[in-house]
Amino acid sequence: LTFVGSENHYPNQDAVDWFCHEVAPCLRVQGFKFVFQVIGTWKSRYVKSLQAVCPEMELVGYVEDLREYLNGSIVLVPIRIGSGMRMKILDAVSSMASFVTTTKGVEGIDLRHNEECLIADSATDFAAAVIRLEADKKLQVRLATQALKRLRELYNPQEMLERRLAVYDEILQNNTN
């Protein structure tokens, strides 16, 4: 299980804190054995306090090549606050890694539950999604493949250019009337 993000962005702190305090206990209750890799820059004092409640957490720190860590991993995006497109999801998709996220985590990217990813908003549902995904390698491959296909369809540069030009044409036509 892998999380990508640094401590200097508060939504990442909240996400890792929520996973360690709320989701990890749900995983343990189910007898699920895991390692929670956190990629990014974090202060050791904060990491130690989280490891006290989540000994499965391992700080990887900064890495040059995310694909090396993400490929074959289940990426966790337990984001509950913030806005904007989640680069960690784009990193997962480009690495062909399946991922579990929250509704907030996938906000801004038109990916669908059970089609391109698993979406869960409560700690128990998030843990269940992690366990489900870990147990089903075919599901991992299907979600990763579908996510890449969907993003290529949605964000095709040529189609985006054509949509932008259509908007410009409409604006120009409205201004001339």
Could you say what each language-model-derived stretch is?
Residues 1-71:
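Conserved catalytic-core segment of nucleotide-activated headgroup transferases in glycan assembly
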Residues 8-11, 84, 118, 152:
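Glycosyltransferase donor-binding loop in the core domain
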Residues 56, 70-84, 95-98:
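Acidic donor-binding loop of glycosyltransferase active sites
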